[in-house]
Amino acid sequence: MAKKVTGYLKLQVPAGAANPSPPIGPALGQRGLNIMEFCKAFNAQTQKEEKNTPIPVVITIYADRSFTFEMKTPPMSFFLKQAANVKSGSKLPGRDVAGKVTSAQVREIAERKMKDLNCDSIEAAMKMVEGSARSMGLQVAG
């Protein structure tokens, strides 16, 4: 028989940098989960990722205080800022241009994010990436 799920917890944790300090410690601790077990497992799975890359993680909490977690791909904004070589998006998207990304970079980001996006084709994924870029004030060239 399957374990009874009592809840889900969504966090964004830097790759290889999970530790019991806030925000991870309090979020897991108040639900009675083993904080160090999560930190060790997460850090082991993210050691091949670039350090401090934000990794969204969904933790499934069970009634017996055990858990499983699923890692997603880093946020699209992280990839776009990296591709455009900017620290943050525009304060006035649509008016001010914060940077530029090429179609090749958009395709590369779409291919990396494909498993987390709700679309079937790479072209649809590219349109989602382009929309996110425009909402950040980035110009899509090419």
UniProtKB/Swiss-Prot annotation:
GO CC, alphabetical: cytosolic large ribosomal subunit
A Pfam family recorded for this sequence: Ribosomal_L11
BP-aspect Gene Ontology terms: translation
PROSITE patterns: RIBOSOMAL_L11 (PS00359)
Subunit-structure text: Part of the ribosomal stalk of the 50S ribosomal subunit. Interacts with L10 and the large rRNA to form the base of the stalk. L10 forms an elongated spine to which L12 dimers bind in a sequential fashion forming a multimeric L10(L12)X complex.
Family designation: Belongs to the universal ribosomal protein uL11 family.
Protein name: Large ribosomal subunit protein uL11
